């Protein structure tokens, strides 16, 4: 590949020891590449919706909430998020019974409930059928616009990129970089 996974690993602070990066990563006027992973406050959504199948949908979402949120406010935040995403009443549902689109929504909700300062999207729409993909894509970008957080997205399909976005073609960049070396 051209380094997409390596870039994301570096951004979240999980770069394998056999790799190295130079440069700095800044977010909201703070250098974050020197911070531990947990302090970077970067959410990530993978192409496979990674949920903990031993927990209910609601328990998966409760895991993401900041520790500062206490008592009934935790449950209310999760129920509000489920309702916003069209999954009201799914709190006690087993994640294994969810459709692919529902799992993707729960995974995104979990990333957003953690209150990230930025969001990384790693091919989040690629495994969804065309109709579901369009709806989910619109919903995802509506949610992140409301939160006003930056998004870095990896995709092979330019239809997944909002029209007002900046695009870096890493294949071209990688090709040019290797010519300069």
Which ranges hold each PLM region?
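ABC ATPase NBD coupling module
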Residues: 30-46, 67, 71
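Hydrophobic anchor residue at the start of the ABC signature
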Residues: 108
């Amino acid at each position: 590949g051209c380094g997409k996974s390596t870039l994301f690993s570096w951004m979240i602070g999980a770069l394998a020891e056999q790799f190295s990066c130079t440069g700095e990563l800044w977010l909201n006027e703070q250098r974050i590449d020197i911070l531990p992973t947990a302090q970077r406050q970067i959410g990530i959504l993978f192409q496979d919706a990674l949920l903990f199948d031993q927990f209910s949908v609601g328990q998966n979402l409760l895991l993401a909430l900041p520790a500062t949120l206490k008592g009934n406010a935790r449950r209310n935040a999760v129920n509000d998020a489920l309702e916003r995403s069209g999954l009201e009443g799914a709190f006690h549902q087993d994640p294994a019974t969810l459709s692919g689109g529902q799992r993707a929504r729960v995974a995104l909700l979990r990333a957003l409930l953690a209150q990230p300062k930025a969001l990384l999207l790693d091919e989040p729409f690629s495994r969804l059928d065309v109709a579901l993909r369009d709806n989910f894509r619109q919903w995802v970008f509506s949610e992140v616009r409301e939160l006003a957080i930056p998004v870095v997205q990896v995709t092979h399909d330019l239809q997944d990129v909002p029209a007002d976005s900046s695009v870096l073609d890493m294949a071209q960049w990688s090709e040019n970089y290797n010519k300069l070396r």
